[in-house]
Amino acid sequence: MTTDRAPRVAMLSVHTSPLDQPGTGDAGGMNVYVLELAHALAARGARVEVFTRATRSDVPETVVLDGVDAAGRALTADDARDVLLAHDVPPGVTPPVLVHHVPAGPFEALDKNDLPGVLCGMAAGVLRSEAARRPGWYDVVHSHYWLSGQVGAIAAQRWEVPLVHTAHTLAKVKNASLGPGDSAEPSVRVVGEEQVVADADALVASTPVEARELVELYGADPARVHVVEPGVDLERFRPGGPGARDEARRRLGLPTDRPVVLFAGRVQPLKAPDVLVQAVGVLRASGRPVPLLVVLGGPSGRPTAVRELRALAVTLGVDDDVVVRPPAPRDELVSWYRAADLVAMPSRSESFGLVAVEAQASGTPVLAADVGGLRTVVEDDVSGRLVPGHDPQVWAEVIADALADAPRRARWAAGARQVAERYAWTTAADQVLKVYAVAAEPR
């Protein structure tokens, strides 16, 4: 990789587009990660092109995002094209990020277990894109999730450039943390991950926990594993002023006279929203104050997941205490965090936990399962609580204790913002650029 200019990056996100709405289907924290990292790298002069599988026939072949000239004005289409094709990015210019929708398989969303069958088509589409450029155009391939890693290994070998891989989640970790009704990850994924770990010139882990899992469970060379903590948009996600909570609740149609606990994420066994519904049931049965539980998310995996969660609430007699809303756009999400007294994450596995960081940046304490990356991003009794296990009785006690102690919640809220301020995309981008440079060195 040349060192006299910022790199040209082929970023792969095969199974989900960074433009998709997080919180339903396969869209989640990884979508946010890819998009935010791409923008942060572009702000440092890198030219980033994201390749994702086209799931509809009516999506544009290429979407051009942002791009700013030296005076801070948005680039015109012609200027954006000139910047993308130039040898060097002019000083003060932020190049646009491109998102390419690659036809591979049917124009529809596919279950992740069916996606290995379209990887050859995806690889061919990525290689065709490079063929339209000058030879040696890309400097590095950065793949996200194991499916992208399979395509990335082919592209990196063909272009003779380094492969950097971010797993986001790992099958062996998930299979050790299955919840009721959850399905084990197939062996094809386990083998695929092992191949990518062996092929990659550098592996990016979000936390020291994930780095250790890559080494201990997948035999990764510790020298090739780099911990780069993701960032959070600290301008978008920040505490409101006096009265912000009630204002957010009125805007969102939530009561102002009742505690609110928020779950934001996909409705699936891995995220365990059922634990929170059962915890509300425990509180209702015990006669203690019961918060309103807001589940902000859509189904992932089973289309019936939301209906099943509502049915559980009815069975437990807490259907009036549980509200399910669809995923919120990014600009609206901060209002949901501000509206909540607590954000709860009873996940059975999390490689990082972006929701926890966003909530803390918004000044909202987090109750998180004591698992994976959540142990890193939530500081126990500083920005919330780390809750052992997934027993609804335990979660009910922790929720009740937190809601009954307003001074402690106020202390947590202040600590939450301080914890979140450690996570900045600018820092993450700088560290990833260093990883790209290291990956280009001979092994």
Curated annotation (Swiss-Prot):
Enzyme class label: transferase
GO MF annotations, alphabetized: acetylglucosaminyltransferase activity; D-inositol-3-phosphate glycosyltransferase activity; magnesium ion binding
Residue sites binding UDP-N-acetyl-alpha-D-glucosamine per the record: 21-22, 29, 266, 271, 350, 358
Cited InterPro entries: Glyco_trans_1 (IPR001296), Glyco_trans_4-like_N (IPR028098), Glycosyltransferase_grp1 (IPR050194), Mycothiol_biosynthesis_MshA (IPR017814)
EC number(s) given by UniProt: 2.4.1.250
UniProt keyword annotations, A-Z: Glycosyltransferase, Magnesium, Metal-binding, Transferase
Highest taxon, organism lineage: Bacteria
Family, as annotated: Belongs to the glycosyltransferase group 1 family. MshA subfamily.
PANTHER family, sorted: SULFOQUINOVOSYL TRANSFERASE SQD2 (PTHR45947:SF3)
The protein's name: D-inositol 3-phosphate glycosyltransferase
The species this protein was found in: Cellulomonas flavigena (strain ATCC 482 / DSM 20109 / BCRC 11376 / JCM 18109 / NBRC 3775 / NCIMB 8073 / NRS 134)
Gene name of the record: mshA
